[in-house]
């Protein structure tokens, strides 16, 4: 039909590592329970955006993020030598993610030829928190956190439904997350990039800081080798926002006998800058 030319197909971001990770089970005798990730959304956007295809796409991406993180967290736990159980674990991993989406300066414009559309700016901020808890002594826990945000606000220009029926060139609004109205490809790419950056950042933080099951009770060297199958993925690197301004990984430890961790002072400073709560998006 005539409307198809208004749309561009943009596939969903691929969270899968290019090389599947092979896990050789290690019989450490240490078990872990993985709780489902708790997602908390905090949105501040216009009613127009509520019905836009980008909003539908972001919701779908959040589902994919959760599903893929849960799969890879399981892989990392197995790589570290834990046996995954659902009852009576030695340790528990609790993960929560908060996603803040903000639309600024939304302005509606009407045009006889092209219908009604909204111009605005969008920002997204992710914060992840993973607690590694000793099930036999819940005072004994390690807290890992990761955060990522869009480098800058993304300029949007999206069509909205016109109620008065006068317009002879009505724009069809897509409700399919991979079928975007023309002009939304670049914003979608920037949004996808931030999801992928947060995904990788969170997994690397966990991989670098989760103690090996065989090392529990010993001093753990802090290696920064990274989660191999992700580090080897060159396409990931190209699409990552700048690491310095954007991401920080921090480790906070409640006093524990058997899981020493070494938070570096730079991480601590980074974190306080990001959590001053004044302005999330510059």
Give, region by region, the residue ranges found by the protein language model:
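A generic structural signal for short, solvent-exposed coil/turn residues
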Residues: 24-26, 85, 118
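Surface-exposed short loop/turn segments
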Residues: 87-160, 263, 271-275, 280-281
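Short secondary-structure boundary motifs at beta->alpha junctions and helix caps
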Residues: 52-59, 114-121, 135-205
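A structural "domain/chain start" motif
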Residues: 1-75, 174-282
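Short flexible/disordered coil segments
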Residues: 73, 77, 95-104, 145-168, ...
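A short, well-structured beta->alpha microelement
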Residues: 74-88
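Sequence-level detector for tyrosine residue identity
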Residues: 45-48, 82, 91, 100, ...
């Amino acid at each position: 039909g005539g409307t198809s030319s208004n749309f561009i197909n943009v596939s969903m971001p691929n969270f899968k590592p290019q090389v599947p990770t092979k896990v050789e089970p290690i019989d450490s005798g240490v078990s872990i329970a993985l709780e489902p990730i708790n997602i908390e959304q905090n949105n501040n956007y216009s009613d127009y955006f509520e019905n836009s295809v980008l909003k539908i796409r972001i919701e779908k991406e959040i589902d994919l993020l959760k599903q893929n993180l849960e799969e890879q967290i399981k892989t990392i736990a197995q790589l570290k030598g834990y046996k995954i159980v659902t009852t009576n674990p030695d340790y528990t991993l609790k993960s929560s993610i908060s996603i803040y989406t903000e639309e600024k300066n939304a302005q509606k414009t009407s045009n006889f030829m092209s219908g009604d559309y909204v111009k605005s700016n969008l920002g997204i901020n992710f914060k992840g928190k993973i607690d590694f808890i000793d099930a036999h002594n819940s005072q004994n826990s390690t807290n890992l956190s990761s955060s990522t945000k869009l480098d800058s606000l993304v300029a949007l220009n999206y069509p909205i439904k016109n109620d008065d029926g006068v317009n002879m060139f009505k724009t069809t609004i897509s409700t399919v997350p991979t079928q975007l109205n023309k002009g939304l490809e670049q914003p979608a790419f920037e949004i996808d990039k931030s999801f992928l950056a947060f995904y990788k950042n969170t997994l690397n933080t966990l991989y670098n800081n989760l103690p090996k099951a065989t090392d529990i009770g010993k001093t753990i060297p802090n290696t920064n080798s990274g989660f191999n199958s992700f580090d080897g993925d060159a396409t990931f690197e190209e699409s990552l926002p700048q690491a310095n301004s954007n991401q920080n990984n921090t480790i906070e430890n409640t006093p524990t006998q058997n899981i020493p961790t070494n938070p570096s002072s730079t991480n601590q400073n980074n974190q306080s800058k990001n959590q001053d709560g004044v302005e999330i998006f510059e």
